[in-house]
Amino acid sequence: MNDTSITLHHSKVTIAPGSVKNPLCVVAHYLFDTLCPAIFQVEQMKLKEGLISVGSKRVEEPDPLDPEIIKRFDNHFKYDEIDDDYYATEDSDAPHFRRILHWYRDHFGSSPTGASILLPIGALRALRRLTAFSDGRCIVISGDKGNNNPEQFRGLMDPHIAEHGSFSV
C-alpha cells in the first residue's frame, strides 16, 4: 500500500509513476474490505476512531500460527475521540479523507442514534498509487461488499468481522 513502484518478479521490470503509457484496468475483487479499513463512529457531532484489539478466546495458544486461531478470535473495540485534523499527516489524500469524515460528522452529528462508518483507506491509497503509474488514467472494476446508502450506517455498533479462511472487516 505504501510502495510507489512495483518490480515484476520474472522480468525484473520496474513499474513506477508515469511509466505506463496506456490506461490501467484494475480488477479489485474484494479489495475494499480487505486492505486496512479505518473504523469511525459519529456521536453528538464528535468523530471517534475505532481501535481493535485481537486476541484468542483461549488463555494460551499452543501454536499462534495455527490457521484455526481465526475461529477463536476475541475482538475488543475501543472508540477514541479525534480532532478535525485527524489525517493531517497524510500525503495528498489528506484533504479528501478529511472532507469525507467531516461530511459524515455533519450528516450524522445531530442524529440521536449516531453512526458507524468503515472507510476503505488502504484500498484508496493503493488505487491512488496504481493510477499514478498511468498518470491518473485508470478504470476500476470492483466486486465487493458494502453499503451505498448512508442511512445504512445509522447506529453505534462494532464492525462485522467476516471469517473465510482469512478475515475481513
Task: Say what each PLM segment does.
Residues 1-3:
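Conserved nucleotide-cofactor-binding alpha/beta core module
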Residues 9-169:
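Class I S-adenosyl-L-methionine
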